[in-house]
Regions:
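Generic hydrophobic alpha-helical membrane-segment signal
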Residues: 38, 93, 112-116
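N-terminal low-structure segments adjacent to metalloprotease catalytic domains
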Residues: 1-64
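Active-site recognition of the HExxH zinc-binding catalytic motif
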Residues: 120-132
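Post-HEXXH active-site segment of zinc metalloproteases
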Residues: 132-155
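A residue-identity detector for tryptophan
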Residues: 38-41, 53, 130, 134, ...
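Short pre-active-site segment immediately N-terminal to the catalytic Zn-binding motif
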Residues: 100, 107-123
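Auxiliary, metal-adjacent structural segments of Zn-dependent hydrolase domains
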Residues: 3, 50-101
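Terminal accessory regions that mediate trafficking to/through membranes and regulate activation
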Residues: 105, 118, 145-148
Length: 155
C-alpha cells in the first residue's frame, strides 16, 4: 500500500518508480511492526503523509533503520512504536552521544528505555515526527534555518 501511494505521489515529479520503491520499503518496515493505528484518524493521516507529502523525510528515516539493522547496540522499542505511528530505537543512528535524533517518523539514539526517556519520546520527539509530516519537504530546510538563526542570535 505504501509503495502504490508513494509511486502515485512521485509520478507528479516523474519519480514514480523510485518513490514507489522507497514507499514499499518504508511501508514494509512499518507494516511488519504494526506501526500505524488504523482505527484512528491520526494513524491514517500519518500513513498518508509519510508516503506522500513527507516522503522526503520518510526516505531519511530509512537511514536510521539501516544503521539500526547494522548496529549491535541497537534495540527496537515496540512499547513506544507499535500503533504509535513512529519507530523508536535505543541506540542506532546518532549524530552525537547523549542526543536523540528524529528523522522522519524514526527516533534513534535513546540511551535507555526508562520512564524519563519514554516521556522524552512522547512529549518532545513526537512533536518532531509530526512536524516532519506536516511540513513535508520543507521541514529539513526550515529546521536548518531555525538552527542557523538560533546560532546567529546566540553569538
Amino acid at each position: 500500500m505504501g509503495g502504490a501511494l508513494s509511486g502515485l505521489a512521485g509520478s507528479a515529479f516523474s519519480l514514480a518508480v523510485p518513490a514507489a520503491v522507497i514507499g514499499a520499503v518504508h511501508g514494509g518496515i512499518a507494516g511488519s511492526r504494526r506501526l500505524y493505528p488504523w482505527r484512528r484518524w491520526q494513524g491514517v493521516t500519518a500513513f498518508v503523509l509519510d508516503h506522500t507529502w513527507a516522503l522526503v523525510t520518510s526516505t531519511a528515516s530509512l537511514l536510521s533503520h539501516a544503521v539500526a539493522a547494522l548496529s549491535k547496540d541497537t534495540s527496537f522499542l515496540p512499547n513506544l512504536s507499535e500503533r504509535q505511528s513512529r519507530h523508536v530505537y535505543v541506540g542506532g543512528f546518532r549524530m552525537r552521544s547523549g542526543f536523540v535524533v528524529t528523522l522522519g517518523n524514526t527516533v534513534s539514539g535513546l540511551a535507555d528505555s526508562g520512564e524519563h526517556r519514554s516521556t522524552l519520546v512522547t512529549d518532545h520527539e513526537d512533536v518532531h515526527v509530526w512536524q516532519a509530516r506536516w511540513f513535508g519537504p520543507l521541514y529539513p530546510v526550515l529546521y536548518v534555518a531555525w538552527m542557523v538563526s538560533g546560532a546567529a542570535v546566540g553569538l
